[in-house]
């Protein structure tokens, strides 16, 4: 037990205490304090608030969707990256709009400082440098925390966002050290405190690649990767990205790299047995890539600059815990990196997490009232997943403080809802990462319409100001008004229209057909028909995109909304005891194994099994009803 100290000289009671100041903690502290709660943020190091521990980037497939959702709900991550990004790209634009996703490289140190300054400016937020070693619990209710220096802080709401710092262990070859990040101490007491109250703990592993010095790389022989010429912001409050963009570069592993890894596998903690924990399935180490995908001749490696004012380059795709001397050889086997100098070695890290099925959908623990978990403590990986959970936990605290009914995010309205639902109902077997494939209604959850879906919740809590909310409503009023107009405009002969037809090589059309039908042609974009709807010429690219998507995909969107209705109707549908899952065409092997093992009695129970995706549940439903999807009764 840590000895308590006289602490009458500073405030020791708060509405909410947030433990940890990574991406989950920063978002939680901001939302809690912005919502009027007197909040204390405790971090072991003020200089690492908002630090990017691994890759210097925000967003990506599904992750970018969540950043936009966090922004729509009043969070800060989108604004932070818009202000500190050094390269912006919209990913997957060659595919359907549901999987378009913004991603940006960050000026790593600038991002961290921007988060710190933003939190420091919050009037309801206090920040202290200390650790939390114990929870203070009475009658299954949290009443405070006890810090590493012996101070007691009292509160009815604690949000734990401990990242990789719970009883953590760093591995580089046979080298081990009790760090939460390289050269930063672990926290042991809190794990013991959680176990004391019968919360189920487990161990997970993650890793990071080496960083190299830019001046030691021959960039001239590498493939250059530029950002978008007209970058899309993350935040709905950002009009335009005007910052200077810098390129990334691409190289590849080769036969020499793979031979080197195979020869030294026995020195990898993951393969020597030194690490027993489960690592991220979808972000494997370079050792795992070479072993698991032995038929591949090469693996892509991205060289990502960490900022304008640093020479460090992040080697995306080369996460490793091999010994440092092997890392040097590995890096120097890559084209363009023959003389590369490693300034920070890659490493693996093991850490404690709490089984997220211990949580309610509010992220409050079921066993301890007032205790909330967010981020990697819940078995997730990624800055964006962490930020989303921090926001949800803080929303829940604000609803509790105001005696409001908790807000439960739905799978059908947000990726955040998918994330929380997966965690609390399915749990995790390896570090959880969000993908668009996890969302069964992803056409409704596009990155461009997050404000329409979610901003009302932030507005209701006072986290989104009146001006922003009014701007959002006016935007969609404009879109809806012009959309209705497009349904009524007939195609008429004109010089401009004939030029468009000639340019696109279109011959099969009819004058008199409505403009919406013409816009649904894959080769026609909204910009092509602006001369017929001149009011959109002054719109932002985002508004034009929303209008185009809603018209082009209106049939699919309508079908998706109907699907939600019939799914809700059949959630309680019983699964026959004698069902043969192997006879269901299209069902994944993993899903078959899990379903045979768990033997769920209803579709809802099947949907809550880890490894069973929404598409698998759809197939089971169609099989039970003995019909194809389009034949299943909707109403």
From Swiss-Prot:
SMART domains per UniProt: GIDA_assoc_3 (SM01228)
A GO molecular function held by the record: flavin adenine dinucleotide binding
Subcellular location: Cytoplasm
GO CC terms: cytosol
UniProt keywords, alphabetically: Cytoplasm, FAD, Flavoprotein, NAD, tRNA processing
Keyword check for tRNA processing: yes
Annotated binding of FAD, by residue: 20-25
Keyword Cell cycle: no
Positions of disulphide bridges: none
One Gene Ontology biological process: tRNA wobble uridine modification
Binding site for NAD(+): 279-293
SUPFAM superfamilies linked: FAD/NAD(P)-binding domain
Top-level taxon of the source organism: Bacteria
Cofactor: FAD
Record function comment: NAD-binding protein involved in the addition of a carboxymethylaminomethyl (cmnm) group at the wobble position (U34) of certain tRNAs, forming tRNA-cmnm(5)s(2)U34.
NCBIfam families: mnmG_gidA
Subunit structure: Homodimer. Heterotetramer of two MnmE and two MnmG subunits.
Family: Belongs to the MnmG family.
Record protein name field: tRNA uridine 5-carboxymethylaminomethyl modification enzyme MnmG
Gene expressing this chain: mnmG
């Amino acid at each position: 037990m840590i000895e308590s100290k006289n602490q009458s000289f500073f405030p020791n009671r708060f509405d909410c205490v947030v433990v940890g100041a990574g991406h989950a903690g920063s978002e939680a502290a901001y939302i809690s304090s912005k919502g009027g709660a007197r909040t204390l943020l405790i971090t072991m190091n003020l200089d690492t608030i908002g630090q990017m521990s691994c890759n210097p980037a925000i967003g990506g497939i599904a992750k970018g969707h969540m950043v936009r959702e966090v922004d729509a709900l009043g969070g800060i991550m989108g604004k932070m990256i818009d202000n500190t990004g050094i390269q912006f790209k919209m990913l997957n634009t060659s595919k359907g709009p549901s999987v378009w996703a913004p991603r940006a490289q960050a000026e790593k140190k600038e991002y961290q400082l921007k988060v710190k300054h933003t939190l420091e400016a919050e009037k309801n937020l206090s920040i202290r440098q200390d650790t939390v070693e114990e929870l203070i619990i009475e009658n299954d209710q949290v009443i405070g925390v006890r810090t590493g220096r012996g101070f007691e802080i009292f509160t009815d709401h604690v949000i734990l966002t401990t990242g990789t710092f719970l009883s953590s262990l760093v591995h580089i070859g046979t080298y081990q050290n009790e760090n939460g990040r390289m050269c930063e101490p672990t926290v042991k007491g809190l794990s013991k405190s959680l176990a004391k109250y019968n919360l189920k703990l487990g161990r997970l592993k993650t890793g990071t690649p080496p960083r190299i010095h830019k001046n030691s790389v021959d960039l001239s022989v590498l493939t250059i990767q530029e950002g978008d010429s007209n970058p899309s912001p993350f935040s709905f409050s950002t009009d335009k990205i005007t910052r200077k963009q810098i390129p990334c570069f691409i190289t590849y592993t080769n036969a020499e790299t793979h031979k080197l890894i195979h020869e030294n596998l026995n020195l990898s903690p993951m393969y020597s047995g030194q690490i027993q924990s489960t690592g991220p399935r979808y972000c494997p180490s370079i050792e795992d890539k070479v072993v698991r995908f032995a038929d591949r001749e090469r693996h892509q490696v991205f060289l990502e600059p960490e900022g304008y004012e640093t020479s460090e380059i992040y080697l995306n795709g080369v996460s490793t815990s091999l010994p440092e001397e092997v890392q040097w050889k590995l890096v120097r086997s890559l084209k363009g990196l023959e003389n590369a100098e490693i300034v920070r070695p890659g490493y693996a890290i093991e850490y404690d997490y709490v089984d997220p099925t211990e949580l309610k959908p509010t992220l409050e623990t079921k066993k301890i009232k007032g205790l909330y978990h967010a981020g990697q403590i819940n078995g997730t990986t990624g800055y964006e997943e962490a930020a989303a959970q921090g926001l949800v936990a803080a929303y829940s605290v604000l609803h509790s403080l105001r005696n409001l009914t908790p807000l439960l995010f739905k799978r059908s309205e947000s990726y955040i809802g998918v994330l929380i639902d997966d965690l609390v109902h399915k749990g995790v077997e390896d570090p959880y990462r969000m993908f668009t494939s996890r969302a069964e209604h992803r056409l409704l959850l596009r990155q461009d319409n997050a404000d329409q879906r979610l901003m009302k919740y932030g507005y209701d809590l006072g986290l989104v100001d009146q001006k922003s909310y009014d701007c959002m409503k006016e935007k969609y009023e404009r879109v809806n008004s012009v959309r209705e107009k497009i349904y009524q405009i007939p195609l008429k002969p004109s010089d401009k229209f004939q030029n468009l037809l000639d340019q696109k090589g279109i011959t099969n059309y009819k004058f008199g057909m409505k403009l919406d039908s013409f816009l649904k042609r894959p080769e026609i974009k909204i910009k092509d028909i602006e001369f017929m709807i001149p009011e959109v010429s002054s719109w932002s690219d985002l508004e034009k995109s929303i209008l185009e998507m809603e018209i082009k995909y209106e049939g699919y969107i309508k079908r998706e909304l109907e699907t939600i209705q019939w799914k809700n109707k059949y959630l309680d549908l019983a699964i026959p005891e004698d069902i043969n899952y192997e006879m269901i065409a299209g069902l994944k092997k993993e899903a078959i194994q899990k379903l045979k093992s768990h033997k769920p009695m209803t579709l809802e129970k099947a949907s809550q099994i880890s490894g069973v995706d929404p598409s698998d549940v759809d197939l089971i439903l169609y099989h039970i009803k003995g019909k194809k999807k389009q034949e299943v009764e909707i109403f």
